[in-house]
Structure formats: C-alpha cells, structure tokens
C-alpha cells in the first residue's frame, strides 16, 4: 500500500497527526528532496528505507514503490504542503492504477492556510470577500486562458497565488489590470 502524505508548510510540527503516524509505521519513505523538511524523517522507524526523490525519475520512483509493494511493505510518498494543490501526484497515481497497487491520500497543511495562520489573517471577511481563489502564474505548466490572473482579479476575491515569487512585478501589473487597486493588501 502506498500512502501519499502531505508534509505541510515546512515546520515539522505542522504535519497532520495521521501523516506523522503513517511516517512512524512506514517501511519505505520516498520524500520530495529539498521541498520537504528533513526533520520529518525523524518520525521514521530505525529500519525504514528512505529515498530522496529529488534526482529520481518518475519511473525510478514507481520502481521503488513496485518492489516495496511486492514485498508487502508500507510505503509513504511524502510531498510538500498538501499534495492536492500543485502536488504533481496524478501521474504517480495513474502508474499505480496501471500496476494494480493500492494507494490512499493523507492531506497536509497547504501553504496558503499556513501563511494565513502565521499572520493571524483570514481570507473570508464579511463585506469584503467570501471567496478564495487558488491559482498560479504561467511557468513550465501553461494556465488555461480562461484562468488568467486578470480574469480572477476581476472577481475582487481573496487570492492565494502559488509558484509565482519570481514573477512579482508582472504579477502585480496583471492583478491591477484585472481590477485590484495598487493599495490592496498583499502578503508574500
């Protein structure tokens, strides 16, 4: 069995209790290299086999999972944040489906919620915004035209924008082109 576990925002104590327990029980952990706090690996048992996936291909990750599953081992695939938001787990799950290997997901604390908590903020304020848009700028992965920053900014909702810190000047310009004012509060 493979468990996809969200590692949370980076602080080792922000992993979910379920995620921590899965790490403690794991026979094999495959973690996302520099993206996952290495302190989380301290939850692993003494005999746990640990693999850093930073330099592994998808095929190599799947091969580790396949061999461990054949041996009846419990596998944790440890991803940063919450793997359901920009976690790139679908291709792994598709391969596991093809191989007939069972898997489950254990959510993690997503960066947008960790950031709000660390700043004592909330995204939904009566009379201001009752919606939260989670999106990103174009990068290696294209964004559908109908999901442009400008089109989302037109809603004047709260936004959590991922994977875009290298594009801040362009992001600010596009948010204002979509309707946000220059004095709109923002947190990086």
Question: What is each stretch, according to the model?
Answer:
Residues 1-109, 114:
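Class I S-adenosyl-L-methionine
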Residues 46, 55, 128-130, 184-185:
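Generic structural motif recognizing short loop/turn segments at the entrances and edges of beta-strands
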Residues 2, 60, 70-75, 131, ...:
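A contiguous loop/helix-start segment that scaffolds small-molecule binding in enzyme catalytic cores
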Residues 20, 42, 67, 123-125, ...:
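Short secondary-structure boundary/capping segments
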Residues 11, 82-155, 182:
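Class I SAM-dependent methyltransferase SAM-binding "motif I" and its flanking Rossmann-like core
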Residues 43, 118-119, 174:
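Residue-level signal for well-ordered alpha-helical positions
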């Amino acid at each position: 069995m493979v468990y996809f576990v969200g590692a949370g925002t980076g602080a080792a104590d922000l992993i979910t209790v379920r995620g921590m327990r899965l790490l403690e029980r794991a026979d094999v952990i495959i973690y996302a290299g520099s993206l996952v706090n290495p302190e989380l690996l301290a939850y692993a048992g003494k005999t746990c086999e640990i693999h850093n996936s930073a330099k592994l291909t998808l095929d190599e990750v799947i091969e580790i999972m396949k061999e461990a599953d054949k041996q009846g081992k419990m596998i944790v695939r440890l991803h940063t944040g919450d793997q359901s938001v920009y976690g790139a787990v679908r291709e792994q799950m598709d391969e596991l489906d093809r191989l007939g290997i069972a898997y489950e997901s254990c959510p993690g604390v997503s960066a947008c919620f960790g950031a709000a908590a660390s700043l004592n903020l909330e995204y939904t304020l009566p009379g201001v915004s009752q919606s939260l848009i989670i999106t990103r700028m174009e990068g290696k992965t294209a964004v559908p035209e109908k999901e442009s920053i400008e089109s989302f900014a037109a809603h004047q909702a709260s936004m959590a924008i991922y994977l875009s810190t290298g594009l801040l000047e362009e992001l600010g310009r596009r948010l204002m082109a979509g309707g946000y004012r220059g004095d709109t509060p923002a947190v990086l």
